[in-house]
From Swiss-Prot:
InterPro entries linked to this entry: Elafin-like_sf, WAP_dom, WAP_four-disulfide_core
Localization in the cell: Secreted
Annotated disulfide bonds: 35-64, 43-68, 51-63, 57-72, 89-118, 96-122, 105-117, 111-126
GO molecular function: serine-type endopeptidase inhibitor activity
Tissue expression as described in the entry: Detected in bronchoalveolar fluid (at protein level). Detected in large and small intestine, trachea, skin, lung and tongue.
Domain of life: Eukaryota
GO cellular component: extracellular space
Name of the protein in question: Antileukoproteinase
Keywords in alphabetical order: Antibiotic, Antimicrobial, Disulfide bond, Glycoprotein, Immunity, Innate immunity, Protease inhibitor, Repeat, Secreted, Serine protease inhibitor, Signal
Keyword Secreted among UniProt keywords: yes
Record text on subunit structure and interactions: Interacts with GRN; interaction protects progranulin from proteolysis.
Positions marked as site (Reactive bond for chymotrypsin, trypsin and elastase): 97-98
Length: 132
C-alpha cells in the first residue's frame, strides 16, 4: 500500500488543529465569572480596543465591552440567581465565522434598561426583547 506524499503534511495539519482546539478549550474553562454591567456614559471618540479575548487579560480579568471599547475588567460572580427581564430574545439567523466570539453580556442584569442578554450571530449581546 502506497501513501501519497501529501499524507505526512495532512497528519501534521490535523495534529496542529487538534492541539489548537484542545488548548482553546482548556483556556475557555479557566476564566470564571462574567463582565460587570456596562456604565451608561457617552463615548466621545473611538478608542483602540485594549483586548479582544479574555486570554489577553492578566490573572482573572475578562475582556469586557466598556463605555468606549473593550478593556480588561474584574469579573462578577454569576452563581447567584438572576431575575430575567420580561420578553424573549429575537431569533437570529446565520452563523458566526469567528472561532471565539466575545460575549458582551452573560445575564440580563448586565444590560441597561429593558434590554436582555441574548445570543446574537457572534456571541451574546444586549438586545431589545420581542414582545410575546
Amino acid at each position: 500500500m502506497k501513501f501519497s506524499g501529501l499524507f505526512p503534511f495532512l497528519l501534521l495539519a490535523l495534529g496542529t488543529l487538534a492541539l489548537w482546539a484542545v488548548e482553546g478549550a482548556e483556556n475557555e474553562a479557566l476564566k470564571a465569572g462574567a463582565c460587570p454591567p456596562r456604565k451608561s456614559a457617552q463615548c466621545f471618540g473611538n478608542e483602540k480596543p485594549r483586548c479582544s479575548s479574555d486570554w489577553q487579560c492578566p490573572h482573572k480579568k475578562k475582556c469586557c465591552l466598556d463605555t468606549c471599547g473593550t478593556e480588561c475588567l474584574d469579573p462578577v460572580n454569576i452563581t447567584n440567581p438572576v431575575k430575567k427581564k420580561p420578553g424573549t430574545c429575537p431569533v437570529i439567523h446565520g452563523q458566526c465565522l469567528m472561532l471565539k466570539p466575545l460575549n458582551h453580556c452573560e445575564t440580563d442584569d448586565q444590560c441597561i434598561g429593558a434590554l436582555k442578554c441574548c445570543k446574537a450571530m457572534c456571541g451574546k449581546v444586549c438586545l431589545s426583547p420581542v414582545k410575546a
